[in-house]
C-alpha cells in the first residue's frame, strides 16, 4: 500500500493556494474592468450617439453599460428618457425580463413625459406579463391610452394587440 508523505501534502497545499490566488486575482481584474468608463468625454448628444452605436452592431452588453452610464451622468438631459428606454431594451432583447421590467419602471417613474414615455409603459407592461405579473402588466398595457392619449398611433395599436394577446380585462373608466 502506498502512503502519503508530509512533503506530498505540502506540495499539494501549495498548488491549491497558488490556484486560489490566481483565481482571486482574475476575479478582481474582471470586476475592475466592468467599472471602467465606456462613454467618450464628449457632449451628451455625442455620448448618446456612441451608446446607440453598440445597439446597431448588436453588442447589447456594451450598450447596457453605455446607456446606464449616460443616464447616471446626464439624468436631466433631454435624451435621458430615451437612454433609459434603450437601457431597458438591452435587457429585453437578451430575454432578461426581470431586469427589463425594473429598467422600464425606472424610466416610467423618472421620465414619464419623455418621447419614449408611452412605449416605455407598454414595454413595462409586457415585461411584467412575461415574468408572471399578468395583472400588473395588463394594468400598464390597458392604461396607456388613458395615460398617453396623444401617443403615436403605432404604440396605441401595439397596446391593443398586446391587450388581446395577453387576454387583459378592460380597465373600467
Placement of each model-derived feature along the sequence:
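Acidic, proline-/serine-/threonine-rich low-complexity intrinsically disordered segments
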Residues: 1-50
Amino acid at each position: 500500500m502506498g502512503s502519503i508523505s508530509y512533503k506530498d501534502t505540502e506540495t499539494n497545499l501549495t498548488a491549491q493556494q497558488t490556484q486560489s490566488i490566481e483565481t482571486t486575482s482574475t476575479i478582481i481584474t474582471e470586476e475592475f474592468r466592468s467599472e471602467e468608463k465606456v462613454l467618450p468625454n464628449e457632449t451628451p448628444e455625442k455620448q448618446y450617439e456612441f451608446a446607440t452605436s453598440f445597439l446597431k452592431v448588436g453588442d447589447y452588453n456594451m450598450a447596457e453599460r453605455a446607456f446606464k452610464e449616460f443616464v447616471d451622468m446626464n439624468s436631466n438631459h433631454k435624451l435621458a428618457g430615451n437612454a433609459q428606454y434603450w437601457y431597458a431594451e438591452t435587457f429585453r432583447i437578451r430575454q432578461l425580463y426581470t431586469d427589463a421590467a425594473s429598467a422600464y419602471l425606472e424610466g416610467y417613474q423618472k421620465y414619464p413625459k419623455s418621447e419614449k414615455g408611452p412605449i416605455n409603459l407598454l414595454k413595462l407592461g409586457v415585461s411584467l406579463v412575461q415574468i408572471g405579473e399578468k395583472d400588473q402588466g395588463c394594468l400598464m398595457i390597458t392604461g396607456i391610452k388613458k395615460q398617453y392619449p396623444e401617443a403615436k398611433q403605432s404604440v396605441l395599436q401595439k397596446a391593443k394587440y398586446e391587450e388581446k394577446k395577453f387576454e387583459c380585462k378592460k380597465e373600467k373608466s
